[in-house]
Amino acid sequence: MAPRRRKAKRRRHTLRSECKDKCKCHVQCYVSPRKRRRKLKPQGDDDINTTHQQQAALTEEQRREEVEEEGEERERRGEEEREGEGGEEGEGREEAEEEEAEEKEAEEEEAEEAEEEAEEEEAEEAEAEEEEAEEEEAEEEEAEEAEEEEAEEAEEEAEEEEAEEEAEEEAEEAEEAEEEAEEEAEEAEEAEEAEEAEEEAEEAEEEAEEAEEEAEEAEEAEEAEEAEEEAEEAEEEEEEAGPSTPRLPHYKVVGQKPSTQPGGVPKLCLKMQPQHRSRLPKGKQSHDKVPKKYQARNKFFSQAAPSVLDLSPKSWCWVVDFWGPTDALYRLSRSLSFPGAVSSGIQTFPKGPHATGPWVYFITVYCRTFQTAKEVIKAQKKYEKKYPRSAKLKASLGKFSKSLPIE
């Protein structure tokens, strides 16, 4: 363990003369140097003139005290000299003369100091007069500025009055325009009423036609019900007669549909028999044919993902998804059939066997290079800027397909 050096104990001064006002041993006698050199400063709202007067008054009091002390010392010395040296009167006279001369010199010095103080007071008065003159000039300038501001305010008021008059004129013009607009609106309402009357007449004609069609449908329905009742009666008669051959199934296989997963089992396409006992709701039925212009699109919706999924993911690692309505996605997929990019079939989100709607349709575009994917996205952005109303592929993407980098 390293030896520790003891601190030397501080010696406390016993006498005040040893401190010499430099330490705090005698606290009751200590005066800090900051207080010793602090000068008299104006306090509160006092100005510098009152401060000078206070300083001058203090110096005069000090002088009086000094003069009184000197007089007392002289008297004491005179008494001592008279007691000790009675025979030396000549010397006493000389000393008295010297003292008188010193007193005269002191009085002359006091007179000179009084003159200097008077000169200082005169200089201070002159400075005060100059300050008053400057204040008067400043007041005159302020008065001139106030007059200028009043003149400017008067001008602004005049401008405001003119603006109010203009606003009133504009309001009158606006009222006239409103009256004209009301007249035009009344004319337009009259024209609309005439159109509504025509539409009501047309609707009445359509209702009459619909009533006729409903009457015809009711007759057909009655005939169909009668036919069904006859068929049921015939079946009941057959059942009563005895066991018959097994019934044909209600559905028949008309083709195969590829699986949605690669390498999956193909699904069977079933078609409902035209004659069956189960009743379907009115409207489209399962055996209705798809119009020719939608056949290719219907095939596209049911097709599987492209064979690009079986390839290595490194060569087709750049993927771009496009969302939107089915018809727009169909046209986009047709336009992306070139070597640089391949699009998948229509897909739905959310996926899964137990997923519930609403369905969102999208296609995935697999690009071979990053540059191709970049060009596809760039073309999409260009299409959004050029056709802002169909920015989210709500309209047909034929214009968009023209801007793609098809080789």
Swiss-Prot record:
**Which terms in the Gene Ontology molecular function aspect does this entry carry?**
DNA binding
Q: Which domain of life is it from?
A: Viruses
Region feature (Disordered): 34-268
**Protein's UniProt keywords contain Isomerase:** no
Question: What Gene Ontology cellular-component terms does the record carry?
Answer: host cell nucleus
- Supply the Gene3D superfamilies for this chain: Epstein Barr virus nuclear antigen-1, DNA-binding domain
* Entry-linked Pfam families: LANA1_DNA-bd (PF21501)
> What keywords sit in the KW lines?
Early protein
Q: Where is the composition biased (Acidic residues)?
A: 81-241
Q: Does the keyword Transport apply?
A: no
Its family remark reads: Belongs to the herpesviridae ICP22 family.
Listed name of the protein: Transcriptional regulator ICP22 homolog
Lineage at the top is:
Viruses, Duplodnaviria, Heunggongvirae, Peploviricota, Herviviricetes
